[in-house]
Amino acid sequence: MDKDDSFLISLIIPVFNESQTITELVTTIKKQSCQPAEIILVDGGSTDNTVQLLKNIIGKENGYRIIEAGRAMPGKARNIGTENANFEWIAYTDAGIVLDKDWLFHLQKKTKDTPEPDFIYGNFSPQINNMFEKCATIVYVPPLRPGSIRTKSIASCLFKKKIWQQVGGFPDWRAAEDLIFMERVEEQGTLVVTEPAAMMYWQLRPDLISTFKKFDLYSKYNVWAGRQAFWHYGIAKQYAVILLFIFLGILHSWYWLLLLPVWLMARAIKRIASHRFEFGWKPLYNPVAFLLIIIITLTIDAATFSGWIKALLQKDGYRKVSME
């Protein structure tokens, strides 16, 4: 299928303190085989030189707009960008991402399906440069299977603007706003399809500390959004069983404690198995990788409980989210 110049798309990107990554993203936008009709970058109050850098990169190029929105979370920034978009079809991606040169082309091509879809999700993969990033992918990135996308991501999608209008846009949250938006889209009976070939690449957190901070924040906002059933309760049930094993080990027989390493290894093996189409079974036989998978898993568990506790203690945040 050749590029359809008559198919006009508005590409919306929220940005905040992205001076280290924004140049690469804009470069991959310029290399798209299917060019968007307009690119709207909504800055959410960057305190570094992101805005000035964008102005230098873009210059007087046609089609680019920078909106300085003041302090704006990702959801609010997307709302502002979408509200200001001039065209029927809206594409979303995020800063810190590298787009495959045919990403938008494949999304656009999918609109030619019959019946015409209202919402198209593309694919994504993490950028893997070292063992930590590979193990992190195994732990918390959804697996990539042949012929399908990893999971639905708001940072790789194309849809009709009317869908955004019908669901009322995004809640103005720091995290989980994308999940709420996507759920509202599905609840409306929107015709949603996927396109595995539309690939973008995103950066993982580079170490345990930043990984903990990320999941601590996500955990807190997911609790405020009332989404514990999708994440927290499952983890809590596992640890309740582990506490039972510990008590039995203390009160009955130390043999019960042997179930602790078995539980940890089983979780690691399950994750390795789910990613076998990407990495094969090699991480299972690499003791360093296997141990690192367990450590990252426990780090995320700790962040889950930490964020959960913070959400329960910070009632103002709960009330703010519940009123959105």
Q: Model-found features: residue ranges?
A:
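Membrane-embedded multi-pass helical conduit in multi-pass membrane proteins
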Residues: 240-315
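A recurrent flexible, glycine/aromatic-enriched loop bordering the glycosyltransferase active site
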Residues: 126-127, 141-159, 174, 200-203, ...
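Glycine-rich, basic loop-to-helix element that forms the pyrophosphate-binding segment
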Residues: 68-85
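Catalytic donor/gating beta->alpha subdomain of glycosyltransferases that bind UDP-sugars
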Residues: 171-230
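Conserved donor NDP-sugar-binding/catalytic core segment of glycosyltransferases
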Residues: 102-133, 203
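Short aromatic/hydrophobic "clamp" motif used to bind/position activated sugar donors
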Residues: 90
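A conserved acidic beta->alpha catalytic loop
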Residues: 43-52, 94-97
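Short, acidic, metal-binding catalytic loop of nucleotide-sugar glycosyltransferases
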Residues: 27-36
